[in-house]
């Protein structure tokens, strides 16, 4: 008996609920039918044709999809919040079961033809015709999503440590300011739901309303709202993949001068570095904006690296040529000997060149001034001159002449060898100097290219 009564109560409640739903649906159906019965969506929603429609526009930035530096296009995911009053879509909630808000298809009512003026590659107008929210006062709120591809002039002077000021210019396409007025919802776009980008950081963003007078109709204003977005690039990707490899190429170029010339691999290493750098530049050239308005910082640095490597190859050729010089083809000038053999080694604190002793006493044989030490290989102190009749012996004289010839030939070879060693020593000194100079230029060049811009960014905060 008790179970039966519970069943009846539940059935009654279900019937009342269904009746409420049916009545609510009937009220909404009747309301929509009455509102749209004689509605003309072509005519502006004003009480008198001299009045204007006041539209409030708010831009909600959801995502910065991409920034195409080459084609200078910024792709964004946005929502355009538009509000206005349609005087023909008002009702008394008491006549329709207390309904205060309804949702209507946007295709069934008048819509402002708001477009993106600086569109670059895409749709000028909104293409996703979502439903709009209408309340009993005639106030309409429509927030359609859109993917905008806007033109943005990319200033590449400080790339990749650059800031870009990109704009979105929104305006009514067919109505002038006397027919449809637009005003920004706020002086800043809404970034409350913005998804952070891995490449860009929003530094500042603002919106301004403009009255524009064209030459065709100088007395009629056309209104637009322009949003400015100041974006700063996160340079980590380019630092790791471009700047650091170029810096390593520069250091590797300097190490060419640390490699001994006798190894025969100095030129091989130089050419290998040049080829590697060329291939590397061909790969990364597509990452750099192709514009002739300015040379970006990273382009200057790559040009510096290329000149640096080519200069090292030219100088390496000179060093190798110096290393292989001989006294038969090149006589060392006295100033070269004084600077590169006597002075610079002492200044740079590396070992000086060892030279053969010139304190050799000359020992004469008979009247022909033959050095006894050249013949016997031993130093003889004092001048020993033989004054014997053996000088008249032809065999002895012939033997002495032969020994003298051999001694002079050995002396000539020794002088030639010493001269060649001097050239090699000069080449080694030049290598040491160039190693220090190139490493210093590498560091100074890198700092001079990027330091100024990095200081500016640090001061801006």
UniProtKB/Swiss-Prot annotation:
Main location: membrane
Keywords: Cell membrane, Disulfide bond, Glycoprotein, Ion channel, Ion transport, Ligand-gated ion channel, Membrane, Postsynaptic cell membrane, Receptor, Signal, Synapse, Transmembrane, Transmembrane helix, Transport
Membrane topology: Multi-pass membrane protein
PROSITE patterns with a match to the protein in the record: NEUROTR_ION_CHANNEL
Membrane side Cytoplasmic: residue ranges: 321-432
Parts of the chain that traverse the membrane: 235-259, 267-285, 301-320, 433-451
Extracellular side: 25-234
Residues carrying covalently attached carbohydrate according to the record: 165
Protein name (Swiss-Prot/TrEMBL): Acetylcholine receptor subunit alpha
Species name: Tetronarce californica (Pacific electric ray)
